[in-house]
UniProtKB/Swiss-Prot annotation:
Organism: Xenopus laevis (African clawed frog)
Occurrences of domain EF-hand (ranges): 68-103, 104-139, 151-186, 188-223, 229-264, 265-300
Segment forming the signal sequence: 1-19
CC per GO annotation: endoplasmic reticulum; endoplasmic reticulum membrane; extracellular region; Golgi apparatus; melanosome; sarcoplasmic reticulum lumen
Motif Prevents secretion from ER: where in chain: 312-315
Protein name: Calumenin
Residues binding Ca(2+) 5, per UniProt: D242, N244, D246, K248, E253
Positions of Ca(2+) 6 binding: D278, N280, D282, K284, E289
Lineage: Eukaryota, Metazoa, Chordata, Craniata, Vertebrata
Family, similarity comment: Belongs to the CREC family.
Superkingdom of source: Eukaryota
Places the protein is found: Endoplasmic reticulum membrane; Golgi apparatus; Secreted; Melanosome
Binding-site positions, Ca(2+) 4: D201, N203, D205, E212
Role description: Involved in regulation of vitamin K-dependent carboxylation of multiple N-terminal glutamate residues. Seems to inhibit gamma-carboxylase ggcx. Binds 7 calcium ions with a low affinity.
Length: 315
């Protein structure tokens, strides 16, 4: 039996549950920056390239001639225009940027897909996932082992059913991606919140009190004095996390904590790209308007000199 999938699950569990006593565990799912480059169009469009293509694929376009960049960009426009009406809206551009930024997620799913799709039908059923991940562990458990594989499987099945939109217990690649990376999908946010609350709620009342909140982040382990950040977290809980000041966090308060709806970098970047490229100011972009501003969207050797990088043909 292949033990790698279960070891991956256990590895993630251990990483989430074990930490140094004074080390803060962060459960917040942050909206990541689109690029580590400075966003200053007066200097260059490197930030925009990373946002539109993803950092790795932006390097590819740096090695193309202007003509090649325009040709490939034109092909990409067809993928962004989801309703095929000949226009790219801010919403479609936002969706594309989010997808480009999630490329690492999809790459991770691709690496695992063949291992779980045992029947090679382009789908992964719950039975396939269960058999590959758990297999004989469910039948041959050490009673002295405190880790409950059956409970872990029940939790996985619940998440699988949530990701499986049509309820047939068979996941498409997109549904399987939502199962493996629920924090990346809006319709999976409730399960992320539920699993987090189950992890932290030790007394089983369905809520998170102050001591449970702190206990999840910090293990006293005989420390005489709490680190300063622990005191700060106590204040954060009482003043901001517990919005109704009843001493506990409910589902909505927990959601606001771990899935903050702050600044959306993808939406901001799509507005910026439309503003800079929309010649007739109708609020949407044609293929011609985008290709005309190819240096803003993707760049080329003519706009980005320097790095000697390996060229590939992903797009």
């Amino acid at each position: 039996m292949n033990k790698r999938p279960l070891l991956l699950c256990l590895g993630l569990w251990v990483a989430c549950t074990l930490s140094k006593p004074t080390e803060k565990k962060d459960r917040v799912h942050h909206d990541s920056q689109l690029s580590d480059k400075v966003h200053d169009d007066a200097q260059n469009f490197d930030y925009d390239h990373d946002a539109f293509l993803g950092a790795e694929d932006a390097k590819t376009f740096d090695q193309l001639t202007p003509e090649e960049s325009k040709e490939r960009l034109g092909m990409i426009v067809g993928k962004i225009d989801l309703d095929n009406d000949g226009y790219v809206t801010e919403g479609e551009l936002t969706a594309w940027i989010k997808k480009a930024q999630k490329k690492y997620v999809y790459d991770n799913v691709e690496r695992q897909w063949q291992e779980f799709d045992l029947s090679q039908d382009g789908l992964v059923s719950w039975d396939e996932y269960r058999n590959v991940t758990y297999g004989t562990y469910l039948d041959d458990q050490d009673p002295d082992n405190s880790f409950n594989y059956k409970q872990m499987m029940i939790r996985d099945e619940r998440r699988f059913k949530m990701a499986d939109k049509d309820g047939d217990l068979v996941a498409t690649k997109e549904e399987f991606t939502a199962f493996l990376h629920p924090e990346e999908f809006d319709y999976m946010k409730d399960i992320v919140v539920l699993e987090t609350m189950e992890d932290i709620d030790k007394n089983g009342d369905g809520l998170i009190d102050l001591e449970e909140y702190i206990g999840d982040m910090y293990n006293h382990d005989g420390d005489a004095n709490e680190p300063e950040w622990v005191k700060t977290e106590r204040e954060q809980f009482m003043e901001f996390r517990d919005k109704n000041h009843d001493g506990k966090m409910d589902k909505e308060e927990t959601k606001d904590w771990i899935l903050p709806s702050d600044y959306d970098h993808s939406e901001a970047e799509s507005r910026h790209l439309v503003y800079e490229s929309d010649h007739n100011q109708d609020g949407k972009l044609t293929r011609e308007e985008i290709v005309d501003k190819y240096d803003l969207f993707v760049g080329s050797q003519a706009t980005d000199f320097g790095e000697a990088l390996v060229r590939h043909d992903e797009f």
